[in-house]
Amino acid sequence: MLGVQRGECEDRPERAEPLSDAEMEIIQHTWGHVYKNCEDVGVSVLIRFFVNFPSAKQYFSQFQDMQDPEEMEKSSQLRQHARRVMNAINTVVENLQDPEKVSSVLALVGKAHAVKHKVEPIYFKIXSGVMLSVLSEDFPEFFTAEVQLVWTKLMAAVYWHVTGAYTEVGWLQVSSSAV
């Protein structure tokens, strides 16, 4: 399974690199354009994620056997999860000026995925990369090289917070063959 071991978050930097006010403004401006089509964008992200990384589907009993992207696109469960993902990102973006709120939201996401769903933390990093690709392809007029760098910084911070929650709940390192 991706050759990843549980505990992938143990090489975490001490803290996430903070966003400047200008970077927060860039994120909020570009997100406004994305969020107008949040469900469709979220569905595109999840479909590409599952097509390119089919091992991620193991965590979704409702659509883990779907192979066809068109079938995935019609799945109400996939659409529902896409909305949840996009709404979580929206909450982060809307609260960039409130680091405690961002930390709290991402801690809840991380703990749920670690404890309840047992999702390997590396999938957050992978999904972030997929999301950045989809956003830059679907919104090229807004996602310039500079904007992509700012969003990469945000996604790194999201990953840092989520993996912090994994560490907090005692995510243990085990052999990847045991996963």
Swiss-Prot record:
Any GO CC annotation of this UniProt entry: cytoplasm
List GO molecular-function terms, semicolon-separated: heme binding; iron ion binding; nitric oxide dioxygenase activity, heme protein as donor; nitrite reductase activity; oxidoreductase activity; oxygen binding; superoxide dismutase activity
- UniProt family annotation: Belongs to the globin family.
What does the annotation say about its assembly with partners?
Monomeric.
Entry keyword set: Cytoplasm, Heme, Iron, Metal-binding, Nucleus, Oxidoreductase
Q: Which gene encodes it?
A: cygb2
| Reactions it catalyzes | Fe(II)-heme b-[protein] + nitric oxide + O2 = Fe(III)-heme b-[protein] + nitrate; Fe(III)-heme b-[protein] + nitric oxide + H2O = Fe(II)-heme b-[protein] + nitrite + 2 H(+); 2 superoxide + 2 H(+) = H2O2 + O2; H2O2 + AH2 = A + 2 H2O
- Give all residue intervals belonging to the Globin domain: 18-167
Function, as annotated: Probable multifunctional globin with a hexacoordinated heme iron required for the catalysis of various reactions depending on redox condition of the cell as well as oxygen availability. Has a nitric oxide dioxygenase (NOD) activity and is most probably involved in cell-mediated and oxygen-dependent nitric oxide consumption. Under normoxic conditions functions as a nitric oxide dioxygenase (NOD) but under hypoxic conditions the globin may switch its function to that of a nitrite (NO2) reductase (NiR), generating nitric oxide.
**Primary subcellular site in the record, as a coarse category:** cytoplasm
As recorded in UniProt, its EC number(s) are 1.14.12.-, 1.7.-.-, 1.11.1.-, 1.15.1.1
Superkingdom is: Eukaryota
Designated name of the protein: Cytoglobin-2
Gene3D superfamilies for this protein: Globins (1.10.490.10)
Q: Which GO terms describe its biological process?
A: nitric oxide catabolic process; oxygen transport; removal of superoxide radicals
Subcellular location, record wording = Cytoplasm; Nucleus
Where on this chain does heme b bind?
H81, H113
Give the SUPFAM superfamilies listed for this entry: Globin-like
